[in-house]
Amino acid sequence: MHTHRLDLDDPTVREWDATVLQASPEDGIVLDRSAFYPGGGGQPPDEGVLLWGGVRTRIVGTRKGDEQYLLPAEGDPLPPAGTAVRGALDDERRTALMRTHSGLHVLCGVVFRDYGALVTGGNMEPLTARMDFDMTEVPPDFRDRVAEACNAEIARDRRIEVSTLPREEAFKIPDIIRTATNLVPPEVEIVRIVDIVGLDTQADGGTHVASTAMIGRIEVTKLENKGRGFRRIRIAIT
C-alpha cells in the first residue's frame, strides 16, 4: 500500500489523520495518507510533526524510495506500525514555499514570454529562490524590467490551476516543458500541469497558491552571468 498524497489533492491541507504503515530507524516512517511534500523540482520537502498517544515526533525531511519515507528528528520516538497519528505541517514554511514556487513560475512565464529563454536550473528556500536561464545577452535594464513585469502579473491576480493529463496529450500543449531538458521521467504516464491562466503553463509537481495575488511581491535581488550563455536571476518574496 502506497502513501496517498494529500499535498497533491489539496495544498491547503495542514493537519490530517493517518495510520503508520511502517517505521524503522534506518528508513523512517511511512503513512497511509500524508500532506508532506516530499521534495523535488527544486522545492524542498515539508517539515512538521506527528502526534500520537501524547507523544510528538518531529519530521525534518523525507527520503525517496519505493514509498514516501518521513525522517524523524534525531532522538525522537518512532510510532509503531498500525499507530493512529495526527499529522501537522509547519504552516509558515509550507505557505512560504508555495508563494515562492508560484513566484518562480511567474518569473519563468515573464522571461519566456518577453525574451524566449528556457530554464536551465533553479532552486528555492522559503521566500528566496534562484532560476537560471539560457540567455546570451540581456539589456542593461533587464533586472528592473523583469521585476516590474513580474509584479504586474501578480497584481493581475491570475488564477493558478492544477490539472492532470495523459503524457501524450500533455506534450501536445505548446511549450509545456519550460526547461532546456525535459525533466519528466519517461515512466510518468500522467503529467501534472500547473497553469497560471494567461501567463504560464508547464508540467510541475510542486505546491502552489491559488492565485498570483497570494504570492506577495517579487524583488529581483541579483542578476549573475554564469558563463556559457547562462544568466542567474535571484529573487526574494516579500
Question: Which residues does each PLM region occupy?
Answer:
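Active-/binding-site microenvironments in catalytic and ligand-binding cores
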Residues: 1-238
